[in-house]
Amino acid sequence: MRGIMARKEMITIDKILDTAFAMTREEGFANVTARRVAAKAGCSTQPIFRVYKNMEELWDAVYERAAAYFLDYYSLYPRTGKTPFANLGMAYIAFAREERHLFELLFVSDNQDGKHKKKSMYEILNGDAGNVVYEINLAR
């Protein structure tokens, strides 16, 4: 009689990205390596390179997720006043306090290691929702 083989868990692109993003939040972007992501995800490095061409592609995905995370954070940040840019500034400061590693990645990192395609501060703050443009219109 043959033994029943246990079904292997599939390591998805979402699981890899979620793991790398969580590592960035907890430990900092510099600690996101293929071996460390694989260890945290409970797999070998093979699934990482099956879904990502190379680590640069994964790093870009983590960076994009961090930028989207900041935009979500800002959109949910309480609007306490009508002074233009005050809410944006307060959200920026609170994000730095609460998400130190993501803040460093987005706004402090000089990207000398070439780990990601860095956006300008304006691109991150403005986002698809036009946050900076919205604040400028409030000032008029």
Give residue ranges: language-model regions.
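Helical hydrophobic small-molecule/effector-binding pocket
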Residues: F85-S109, K115
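Amphipathic alpha-helical packing segments from all-alpha helical-bundle domains
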Residues: D110-R140
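Helix-turn-helix
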Residues: K15, T19, M23-E57, A61
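N-terminal intrinsically disordered/low-complexity leader segments
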Residues: M1-I11
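Amphipathic alpha-helical linker/stalk segments
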Residues: D60, E64-N87, I124-N131
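Alpha-helical DNA-contacting segments of helix-turn-helix folds
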Residues: T24, E57-A66, Y73, L106, ...
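Short hydrophobic clusters on alpha-helical segments that form packing/core surfaces
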Residues: I16-T24, A66, F70, Y92, ...
